[in-house]
């Protein structure tokens, strides 16, 4: 059995806001590494649960920003980690294919414009507003095109609510209640890790009964986002049309600033 673990950092217990990369103070450096540690521990809980559920292979995708956030020296040595930045359109979920039995998501956050949610961003607009997707549910849809069910996620209460609505049966582990863009009422990290472990086991056990999240084409896709994680939202590019969500996503991403033609000397830790 193969399990794919998609990760982000904004949804981990204890995270409320980013460090200031323009200020190399002790507090900012410590904050960044503290968030890395919190993310690593939650990912380790998910990895252990996957192997305890009978997984033969577990892929961990370090998907936040630089792709260099998880302290991989501290990960369970049985898993493999996908990290770094490919600067191309089709590498957001590398190594996710139809051979994967289930996808798990750790550290998820709400879409842009969601009231009272932690650092909300990335609001994917489908068919001119008929549906909106977060990064989390976009990952579910891309996996769905491959026939892979998304069985579990962790994050704040707002992203858990969206995932439950769109993916019936998914196990949603709320590790914090978001109070505003930069404030939360969080579980203590050790408790969050315990619940993530239990949630991953429960989700994997349900993998045959949770249907892949599939969006029927043809589709029109655009991305709305904002500065500083607060409204107003603005369209980030030109609307694309395609037969599947995967094709639409790849076409849109190919037009954005982090693709190869737009970057000469990339700073891997700067986004985009």
Model-derived segments and spans:
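Acidic, His- and aromatic-enriched active-site or binding-groove loops in soluble protein domains
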Residues: 77-93, 129-132, 170-181
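Active-site rim beta-loop-alpha module in soluble metabolic enzymes
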Residues: 144-150, 154-206
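Generic secondary-structure signature for well-ordered alpha-helical cores
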Residues: 44, 48-56, 105-109, 148, ...
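C-terminal accessory domains and tails appended to enzymatic cores
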Residues: 192-272
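N-terminal glycine-/serine-/threonine-rich phosphate-binding loop
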Residues: 1-53
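Internal, conserved structured core segments that host functional sites
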Residues: 90-149, 154-160
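Short glycine-enriched loops at secondary-structure junctions
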Residues: 7-12, 63-64, 106-111, 157
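Glycine-rich nucleotide/cofactor/substrate-binding loop typically near the N-terminus or early
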Residues: 14-19, 43-98
């Amino acid at each position: 059995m193969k399990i794919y673990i998609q990760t982000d950092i904004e949804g981990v217990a204890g995270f409320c806001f980013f460090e200031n990369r323009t200020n190399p103070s002790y507090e900012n450096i410590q904050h960044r590494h503290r968030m890395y540690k919190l993310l690593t521990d939650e990912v380790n809980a998910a990895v252990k649960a996957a192997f305890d559920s009978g997984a033969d292979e577990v892929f961990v995708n370090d998907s936040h920003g630089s792709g260099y956030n998880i302290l991989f020296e501290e990960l369970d040595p049985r898993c493999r980690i996908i990290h770094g930045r490919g600067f191309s359109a089709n590498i957001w979920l590398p190594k996710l294919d139809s051979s994967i039995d289930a996808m798990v998501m750790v550290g998820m956050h709400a879409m842009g414009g969601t009231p009272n949610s932690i650092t909300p961003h990335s609001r994917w607009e489908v068919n001119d507003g008929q549906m909106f997707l977060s990064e989390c549910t976009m990952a579910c849809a891309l996996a769905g095109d491959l026939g892979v069910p998304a069985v579990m996620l962790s994050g704040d209460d707002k992203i858990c609510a969206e995932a439950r609505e769109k993916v019936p049966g998914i196990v949603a582990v709320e590790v914090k209640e978001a109070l505003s863009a930069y404030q939360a009422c969080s579980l203590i990290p050790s408790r969050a890790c315990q619940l993530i472990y239990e949630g991953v086991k429960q989700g994997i056990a349900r993998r045959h009964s949770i249907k892949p999240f599939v969006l029927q084409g043809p589709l029109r896709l655009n991305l709305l986002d904002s500065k500083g994680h607060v409204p107003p939202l603005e369209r980030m590019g030109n609307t694309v049309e395609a037969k599947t969500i995967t094709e639409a996503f790849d076409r849109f991403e190919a037009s954005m600033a982090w693709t190869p033609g737009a970057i000469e000397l990339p700073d891997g830790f700067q986004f985009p």
